[in-house]
Regions:
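Intrinsically disordered, low-complexity regulatory regions enriched in serine/threonine/proline
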Residues: 1-4, 30-256
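Amphipathic alpha-helical segments
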Residues: 2-23
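Generic recognition of long tandem-repeat/solenoid scaffolds
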Residues: 23, 27-31
Length: 256
């Protein structure tokens, strides 16, 4: 563990004690109501830059043990604000040989955690509140990205509001909330993308017989879920969410 990481942990542990996070190496994690929240420090470019990634994951999405350590279904903390004067939109650049630079970088990260991350976590503390919070977050980050590019003299031609409909986190939150309209829209977008990718790979001859079968089964599963959503079959999804939540809680036992 390098000096930057040690100092960062020494700052985080006492300052975030009131929020009841558990630490696993460079990840801080907690479970609140029906969601898991975590954030992780990543070292980049041999210590010349650091990035903090955070996530809110519903327990009704089957949480693997690897998800606990962070970096899965995550967002970059730095994106809460518009970045000026650098193309490193998602990280803090740092001179690892300068103690003054290290301290300033850690102080900036801690300010982002206090001002942006903790208030966000407090609002997104269950599936019911986390889904709209994540949607608003993605839109905000998209606008910040465009503004950062503009400051760098780059025009963003992407026509999107930044909301990721492929995201399983929001899909499972929508199921838990009974928001079948959002869940249906999410699955339909994913099904179309899977069909396109399958047809393109077939045309290029990229798929082995096993890969072809796996892709076809995945598409059939999506279509089955779409049918259940269109029919409003709550019993199917109720059982699915119960099974997933039990699986997540079992995997979370190692830290809680």
């Amino acid at each position: 563990m390098d000096n930057f990481t040690k100092l960062y942990i020494q700052r985080c542990e006492p300052e975030l004690a009131e929020f009841h996070f558990k630490r696993k190496r460079t990840t801080f994690v907690r479970v609140v109501n029906d969601v898991m929240q975590n954030f992780i420090l990543e070292k980049l470019h041999g210590g010349r830059a650091y990035r903090v990634l955070f996530a809110v994951i519903p327990l009704c999405l089957p949480i693997e043990k690897t998800y606990i350590s962070g970096g899965v279904y995550s967002y970059a903390l730095r994106r809460f604000e518009i970045v000026r004067g650098t193309m490193a939109f998602d990280r803090w650049e740092c001179n690892p040989k300068s103690n003054e630079c290290i301290q300033a970088c850690i102080e900036s990260i801690m300010q982002f955690i206090r001002v942006h991350l903790m208030p966000f976590f407090e609002c997104a503390n269950c599936c019911r509140t986390a889904l709209p919070e994540l949607i608003n977050l993605e839109r905000r980050f998209n606008e910040n990205r465009k503004a950062s590019l503009q400051l760098a003299g780059i025009r963003d031609a992407a026509e999107t509001d930044g909301v990721n409909l492929f995201d399983p986190v929001k899909y499972y939150m929508a199921l838990k909330n009974g928001d079948y309209n959002f869940a249906l829209k999410s699955r339909q977008v994913l099904e179309r993308q899977n069909v396109y990718a399958y047809q393109d790979s077939m045309a290029r001859g990229f798929l082995s017989p096993k890969s072809k079968l796996d892709r076809e089964r995945a598409i059939q599963t999506l279509r089955k879920e779409i049918e259940y959503l269109q029919a409003g079959d709550t019993s199917y999804f109720h059982q699915l969410l119960l099974q997933n939540e039990a699986y997540s809680k079992e995997n979370l036992k190692e830290i809680f």
